[in-house]
UniProtKB/Swiss-Prot annotation:
The keyword Amino-acid biosynthesis does not apply. Keywords: ATP synthesis, Cell membrane, CF(1), Hydrogen ion transport, Ion transport, Membrane, Transport. It is a peripheral membrane protein. This is ATP synthase subunit delta. InterPro entries: ATP_synth_OSCP/delta_N_sf, ATPase_OSCP/d_CS, ATPase_OSCP/dsu. It is found in: Cell membrane. Belongs to the ATPase delta chain family. GO terms for cellular component: plasma membrane; proton-transporting ATP synthase complex. F(1)F(0) ATP synthase produces ATP from ADP in the presence of a proton or sodium gradient. F-type ATPases consist of two structural domains, F(1) containing the extramembraneous catalytic core and F(0) containing the membrane proton channel, linked together by a central stalk and a peripheral stalk. During catalysis, ATP synthesis in the catalytic domain of F(1) is coupled via a rotary mechanism of the central stalk subunits to proton translocation.
Length: 179
């Protein structure tokens, strides 16, 4: 429901970071702040608590982050506190990362195999998909012995499942339909 709003916040912050040449710095700082919010229970409770005033929450953020992060980024966080959206910072970060990938003409993908890929196999797969999508692709690799063999590739919403496990499932489904 708030995806559009998250994207607008993220785009505004991205444009500020881009003008300052600090996109990577902002992204890294946001990741660390999200981890702090998500992993520090006391901090989370303070910023979540409805009886702690917005003013006190802002003072807390200023005392923690002043001189540690860029002023514009701190101002952004204070706006989120003001709008009661700070607990949804992760969504803004996710959108900002998507914008960054779009600007860099890059997609994310995953390659799953039953055994680790050799570097030349990985390079060949990456080259094939970069040509197909005409974009750079950042692949994560994962070894899943349950696949038995073959390769599973997902780029965006596109999936190519050429694993032994999927072929066995297809044969099983076909045999069950014939009964």
């Amino acid at each position: 429901m708030y995806e559009y709003l998250d994207r607008r916040y993220a785009l505004a912050l991205y444009q500020v970071a881009e003008k300052k040449g600090k996109v990577d710095e902002y992204l890294q700082d946001l990741r660390e702040i999200c981890e702090l919010i998500e992993n520090n229970h006391e901090f989370y409770e303070v910023i979540k608590h409805p009886q702690i005033s917005t003013k006190k929450k802002k003072k807390t953020f200023i005392s923690i982050f002043k001189d540690k992060i860029d002023e514009e980024l701190l101002s952004f966080l204070l706006i989120l506190i003001e709008k009661d959206r700070i607990l949804y910072l992760r969504e803004k970060l996710n959108e900002m990362e998507k914008i960054d990938l779009e600007r860099k003409n890059t997609l994310k993908g995953i390659i799953k195999t039953a055994i680790p890929l050799l570097s030349n196999e990985f390079d060949n797969l990456r080259d094939i998909f970069q040509k197909k999508y005409d974009k750079n692709i950042l692949f994560e690799t994962e070894v899943d012995r349950n696949l038995l063999g073959g390769v599973y590739v997902r780029v965006g919403h596109d999936v190519i499942d050429d694993t032994v496990k999927s072929k066995i499932e297809e044969m099983k489904d076909l045999m069950l339909k014939q009964k």
